[in-house]
Amino acid sequence: SMFKGWFNSSLSNYNAFVAALLNGKLKEMNIYMNEVALSTFSSFDTGTHPSERTQPERFYHGFVLGLLVELRGRYEVKSNRESGYGRYDIMLIPRDYNEGNAIVLEFKVLDLESEETLEDTAQSALKQIEEKNYDAELISRGISRERIRHYGFAFEGRKVLIMEQQ
């Protein structure tokens, strides 16, 4: 139908990050975030002192949330809500459960006391999604586990690493 054709081509109307996220293209998501962070953010935005640990996390959270707002026609975009045993950072719930995957995003800043690399931090974010059972809300709505994707975002200053739960 004409509507379906328009809908499929509408992916090209999304920003590069959103298009990569919806298509599960992890490499492109990483390239986009790192290019934007390097060219746009200052160390003032992203924080450099341990006392500012939650600030960079909030900054990146707000930035990614801003990128995702344009999805609100296709997804419920939820931020800092309770599910399972804690509060997830961002959850995208498809308005049509047969159209697209549900997505859970968790953000973490590299903690040099417990982590050595951005990989450790991204893994820690993914582990938090599992351990705190953030999928509970999605599963209670009838979305199957196969349709749920998890992304852990790790930050250190203007460096970003995004990993996906395999």
PLM feature segments, named:
Residues 1-133, 160-166:
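Extended alpha-helical interface modules used as scaffolds for assembling large macromolecular complexes
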Residues 122, 133-164:
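Nucleic-acid nuclease catalytic cores
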